[in-house]
């Protein structure tokens, strides 16, 4: 039987060679894109209009990946990263690009994919929702790593595409008061007798104070609890422990829940307060979240007694403001704990024109008690999108649909469904929720035309 020789695509010679490439654009993950011998080459850290020296790390039939060795001709958008941990930490991936350049890239990428699938054009674009480029995160989870040999506990973030923990002393995108707590917390945790059994540390900045949630795998002794309590008092922070069952316990005091406000830029009577447990999802950029909610209210323009459905409602981030403005709101969420918290928030704000349901929004919705004719629809799904939920549009027939997206790909796919059902894209806007990263969020307004 004849045998044919086939060269191995990833030979050491092919991968070790260095070459110069010209970068022409960024991909959706923020990596530079170049062309070489008919292949697309992805180069993390490279920017458009740059000439770079690279070394291949992976070769496939139609594409390759390369490591940036040197920037030979820099882009005018290239800047020096502000964070000393940038090149090892996996949190940010665009600090080497100017903030204006990041936003220009994100808006162009959003418009490009939405033009292909939803007929978006330049005139459809609304002004970007932008805020502070640094210290904007009000929440972050730090990983811990205990070294059995040195008996030292490291506190930091995971490296890119790795489970390795990169110890950090600061975070340039985390709220400054929280960033300033990283080193003191690392010292404190290393003083605990139970440091080998500690899990992650979550830091939260809320309108009613600063919070820390420490994951533990076994109960702490009195000495460790006393150290945590003293630290909490010294740094004016609420500390709570989360055990293996997901239960939370306050340290040195009763458990206090973090709270944030919405619509508080108007009259005090218009504001709504949302409390959440450390396990609940909240938008990490408080400044942009307020702007996002305000824009959704403006686009939906809720009127008195209108029936508005809020799918993937979480703990009421959009539902409560809609009800505050007079609409009859139905919120549906797939996570039971979030539904419970949404009901708590509605009661705390004395909002009775608001009903929450727990349900699987990817399942058959035809028999759900809330299914039926509505005036308007708001969607805020996870990255997977809302494709299954949109199959029931004929039964709901909303005049307006506001879609809040954290994934342009699923937004584009779902937009095609809306267009098929007789809706037209009226407005599209970038939401820069995560500056210094490649992540793109957006809001789209669709109106029924037939």
From Swiss-Prot:
Residues involved in S-adenosyl-L-methionine binding: 283, 312, 317, 333, 360, 380
- Molecular function GO labels: 4 iron, 4 sulfur cluster binding; iron ion binding; RNA binding; rRNA (uridine-C5-)-methyltransferase activity
For this protein, the record's Pfam families field holds: TRAM, tRNA_U5-meth_tr
| GO BP annotations listed | rRNA base methylation
Q: Which reaction does it catalyse?
A: uridine(1939) in 23S rRNA + S-adenosyl-L-methionine = 5-methyluridine(1939) in 23S rRNA + S-adenosyl-L-homocysteine + H(+)
Query: Which EC numbers does the record give?
Result: 2.1.1.190
- Catalytic site: 406 (nucleophile)
Q: What class of enzyme is it?
A: transferase
Q: Where does [4Fe-4S] cluster bind?
A: 83, 89, 92, 171
Where is the TRAM domain positioned along the sequence?
12-70
Tell me the NCBIfam families matching this sequence.
PRK13168.1, rumA
Function description:
Catalyzes the formation of 5-methyl-uridine at position 1939 (m5U1939) in 23S rRNA.
> Which PANTHER family does the UniProt entry name for this protein?
23S RRNA (URACIL(1939)-C(5))-METHYLTRANSFERASE RLMD, RNA M5U METHYLTRANSFERASE
Q: What is this protein called?
A: 23S rRNA (uracil(1939)-C(5))-methyltransferase RlmD
What species is this protein from?
Answer: Shewanella baltica (strain OS155 / ATCC BAA-1091)
């Amino acid at each position: 039987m004849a045998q044919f020789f086939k060269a191995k695509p990833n030979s050491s010679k092919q991968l070790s060679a260095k070459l110069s490439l010209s970068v022409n654009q960024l991909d959706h993950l923020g990596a530079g894109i170049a062309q070489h011998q008919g292949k697309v080459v992805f180069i993390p850290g490279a920017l458009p209009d740059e000439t770079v020296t690279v070394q291949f790390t992976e070769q496939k039939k139609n594409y390759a990946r390369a490591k940036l060795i040197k920037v030979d001709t820099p882009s005018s958008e290239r800047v020096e990263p502000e964070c000393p941990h940038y090149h090892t930490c996996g949190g940010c991936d665009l600090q080497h690009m100017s903030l204006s350049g990041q936003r220009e890239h994100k808006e162009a990428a959003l418009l490009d994919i939405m033009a292909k699938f939803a007929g978006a054009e330049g005139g459809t674009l609304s002004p970007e929702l932008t805020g502070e480029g640094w210290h904007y995160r009000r929440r972050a989870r730090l990983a811990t790593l205990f070294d059995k040999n040195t008996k030292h506990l490291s506190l930091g973030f995971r490296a890119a595409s790795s489970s390795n923990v990169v110890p950090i002393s600061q975070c340039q995108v985390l709220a400054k008061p929280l960033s300033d707590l990283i080193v003191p917390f690392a010292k404190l945790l290393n003083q605990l007798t139970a440091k080998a059994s500690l899990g992650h540390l979550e830091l939260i900045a809320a309108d009613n104070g600063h919070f820390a949630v420490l994951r533990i795998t076994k109960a702490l002794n009195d000495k460790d609890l006393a150290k945590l309590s003293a630290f909490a008092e010294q740094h004016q922070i609420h500390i709570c422990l989360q055990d293996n069952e997901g239960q939370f316990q306050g340290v040195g005091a009763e458990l206090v829940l973090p709270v944030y406000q919405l619509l508080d830029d108007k009259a005090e009577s218009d504001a709504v307060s949302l409390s959440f447990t450390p396990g609940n999802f909240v938008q990490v950029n408080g400044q942009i979240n307020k702007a996002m909610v305000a824009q959704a209210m403006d686009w939906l323009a809720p009127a008195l007694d209108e029936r508005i459905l809020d799918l993937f409602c979480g703990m009421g981030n959009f539902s409560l403001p809609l009800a505050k403005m007079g609409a009859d709101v139905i919120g549906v969420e797939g996570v039971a704990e979030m539904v419970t918290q949404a009901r708590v928030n509605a009661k705390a704000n004395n909002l009775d024109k608001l009903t929450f349901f727990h349900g699987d929004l990817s399942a058959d919705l035809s028999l759900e008690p809330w299914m039926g004719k509505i005036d308007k629809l708001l969607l805020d799904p996870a990255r997977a999108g809302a494709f299954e939920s949109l199959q029931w549009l004929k039964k709901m027939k909303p005049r307006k649909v506001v879609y809040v997206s954290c994934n342009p790909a699923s937004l584009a796919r779902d937009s095609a469904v809306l267009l098929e059902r007789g809706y037209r894209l009226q407005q599209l806007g970038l939401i820069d929720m995560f500056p210094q990263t490649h992540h793109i969020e957006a809001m789209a307004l669709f109106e029924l035309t037939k």
